[in-house]
Amino acid sequence: MNKYIFVTNGMARSGKDTFAALMNEFVPTKKYSSIDYIKEIAKLCGWDGQKNEKSRKFLSDLKVLTSQYNDLPFKRIQKQIDGFNKDEKYNVLLIDVREPEEIRKLCNKYKDVKTILIKRNSVKTITSNMADAGVFNYNYDFVIENNGTVDEFKNVVKKFVMENISIEN
């Protein structure tokens, strides 16, 4: 089974989740975000699940703290990759990572990882926290434009899959 790991990035509401859902229509795809486990910790601290500027900064700061303390977010990504490599269910693992230094670290450890930036012109650039502010500070392998309808985006995703993923077993 051919396995592919992509780091995905983009501003909030650029279409990262939609990209993953659409890709899953063409090839079995699992999605994980480097912030997923941090959100669980944040809930223990009283975070209500809202995604506004204040909570985005809180999540970003909490991720920085846990990274500095024991590299927890990266360890959780490694755990996801290990599980994905053993799992016959999925061909593609998409990992959302915002911070350029974390993307570099991941790509340095796992040489086959490729990076994707998803851009949508109608979303505003967020600069209120370190994670979102650094989204465009990386040279991505692929840039996917999401500026049309969902059907148009589906065609973009289909083309990406056809050109970059071999699903032969």
Please place each PLM-identified region on the residue numbering.
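ATP-dependent NMP and nucleoside kinases share a basic, alpha-helical "lid"
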Residues: F26, K30, Q78-V135
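Small-molecule kinase domains that catalyze NTP-dependent phosphoryl transfer to phosphate-bearing small molecules
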Residues: K109, K114-N169
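ATP-dependent small-molecule kinase phosphotransfer cores
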Residues: S33-V92, R98
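ATP-binding Walker
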Residues: S14
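Short hydrophobic/aromatic beta-strand immediately N-terminal to the Walker A/P-loop
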Residues: F6-V7
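Walker A/P-loop
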Residues: D17
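P-loop (Walker A) phosphate-binding loop of NTP-binding proteins
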Residues: G10-M11
